Amino acid sequence: MKLRNKFNKVTAWILTCILFFTMAFSITSEAYGEGYTHAKQFKNCHIYNGIDVSTWNKQIDWNAVKASGIDFAFIKVGGRGWGSAGTLYHDSRALENLKGAKAAGIKIGVYFFSQAITEKEAAEEAQYTINYLHTYGISIDLPIAMDFEYASDSPTGGRLRTANLTREQATNVCLAFCSYVATRGYTPMVYANKSMLTNDMNASTIASRYPIWLAQYNSSATYTGAYSYWQYTSSGTVPGIEGRVDMNFYYSTDGSFSSKINIPVPTGETAPADAKIVYATHIQTYGWEKEETYDGGISGTVGQAKRLEAIKIRNNTGIEGSVEYQVHCQSFGWMDWTMDGDIAGLTGLAKRLEAIRIRLTGQLAEQYDVYYRVQCQTYGWLDWAKNGQTAGSTNYAKRLEAIQIKLVEKGGMAPGNTSKVYVSPLIGYNTHVQTYGWTGTVFDGTTGGTTGHAKRLESISITNLTETSGNVVYRVHGQTYGLSLIHI
């Protein structure tokens, strides 16, 4: 993590003097932070000393780091390349650092160097980070941070800079990362420097929901927004680390560390003990349902035009096995499979669920089939899907409004009709139009191109979207060139 445009020593000294008398206080910590001035809102906080590291810090003697007075460390687990491809990568020393810091008794959090330019990419980065922790069985004490900054190693500032996102777009990208992390039970956090927080995003919107990690390399932080961590230099020296290292303060109101948050859950009566499958949905405007639903009951709303935004399902039979479920979410597409009461979908982003798949595992799958049907915008109640089939729609931008889920003894009769469980386009086509270029894919009889604009069609691409084998074969007659080759 790097910053530009540092104050020179004279400016920093002047600001320190001014802020000392008007809005701040100074402390000298046990080992670090001498001469740094903290904003007055942190006067009653416990202030911890920490670092953040990556492969660039080489091999670290974590016992020496701990002995020197370092309380916590944020460790890079990976990042996204700043080139146009935006390839995800892992930090080669992440696992070594995570295990070493933890063994030394240092509180740990993680960060991911983001170059996300869409909400979907941001969720992908969050998913990558959490999957990394789960793969290696790493438990953390501090938040999962999105390192949102322009690429200082790139002459152009990287793909994040060249994307030229609006403040609203950048804010939504950060919120997408945070929402994904939060729905998985971790505390998310956004790292950014003062300039980005002030000029390139709506930091107050983010800070109203999630902690901020400020980067500002001064002897006092002049950023006036809310923040919980302050990275105050990239030139620190710590025993056990070769060369310079990023240094941080953490302001704790109660003296504790935590990487988990309390996810809102249904607060009303729980399902009866003899219920087989239990579920709850997060509904537009209303949030989580007050009571859980079970065994074929309707979860959600009917006739109110409210989208489902997230869902939790759990096995209540006592039989070995799990309920696994996967949702298709607006802007994000198919998300990871989730299981046994974990949240699928996203809350706080106003994104609709569009389709769902549910399946069983273990002894549960041997004894039961799972049936489910959804109330879908425009189409109403679809028929009952079974054992991993897709229920709902994709490519039509239609919201799910309600769902029923039921376990049926293996081979037993379905709860109702099973013929129409999923609505999807049969054919998609994209046209290239004079002046406008490619206009975007449309489906099943919708007009592609323009009318009334006197613009010529210059090219077309047609795709078979059915699950039936075979191809769409087409050719066009073009000005000057006549009939084209056959396209498949």
Where are these regions (language model features)?
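Bacterial N-terminal signal peptides that target proteins for export
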Residues: L3-I14
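Substrate-binding cleft of extracellular glycoside hydrolase catalytic domains
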Residues: G35-H38, F42-A176, A182-R184
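Tandem-repeat/low-complexity and Cys-motif detector
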Residues: G297-Q304, N315-N316, D342-A350, L360-L364, ...
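Sec-dependent signal peptide cleavage junction
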Residues: F21-G35
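Fold-core signature of tandem repeat domains
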Residues: I277-I283, L308, I313-N315, V323-H328, ...
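Functionally critical loop-and-helix segments that line ligand-binding/catalytic clefts
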Residues: E34-N57, N63, I206-T270
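Aromatic-lined carbohydrate-recognition surfaces of secreted/lumenal glycan-active proteins
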Residues: Y186-T198
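Conserved small/polar residues in nucleotide/adenosyl-binding loops
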Residues: I486-I488
